[in-house]
Amino acid sequence: MANHDPISDMLTRIRNASQKRHENTRIPASRMSRSIAKVLQNEGFISQVSEEGEGVKTQLVLELKYSGKHRHPTIRSMKRVSKPGLRIYKNNRGLPKVLGGLGVAIISTSKGVMSDRDARKQGVGGEVLCYVY
């Protein structure tokens, strides 16, 4: 079956694996998924990103993070904002603060995919891909 929104698919796979407390999850590799995974790793939501396979069958393996003795997921919620049917763009002044700065908005800018904090520092806006907190 064709996947029409790979970003939503990626977020759903991470959300489901995190709720079931899996150690890692596999995601089809693309430039966008690599960039989003890198932002999630830099922001401390996942511990490690690695690649397996070759060519078209390359997959990203994301090692998820948990906290406490009951292994509470670090990622509480992931919400897709800009969708294929309704794109959401914001300038650098209009970039959202997720949970008053506790969460992260992942933004696709002309300078690459980055967190809302990095986009504000660089003074760029772009497409708001998702919220993570």
Curated annotation (Swiss-Prot):
Lineage top rank: taxon: Bacteria
GO molecular function ontology, one term from the record: rRNA binding
Matching SUPFAM superfamilies: Ribosomal protein S8
Keywords from the named record: Ribonucleoprotein, Ribosomal protein, RNA-binding, rRNA-binding
InterPro entries: Ribosomal_uS8, Ribosomal_uS8_CS, Ribosomal_uS8_sf
GO BP: translation
Pfam families for the chain: Ribosomal_S8 (PF00410)
GO annotations of cellular component type: ribonucleoprotein complex; ribosome
Family recorded in the similarity comment: Belongs to the universal ribosomal protein uS8 family.
Function: One of the primary rRNA binding proteins, it binds directly to 16S rRNA central domain where it helps coordinate assembly of the platform of the 30S subunit.
Subunit note: Part of the 30S ribosomal subunit. Contacts proteins S5 and S12.
Protein name, UniProt field: Small ribosomal subunit protein uS8
Protein's organism: Prochlorococcus marinus (strain SARG / CCMP1375 / SS120)
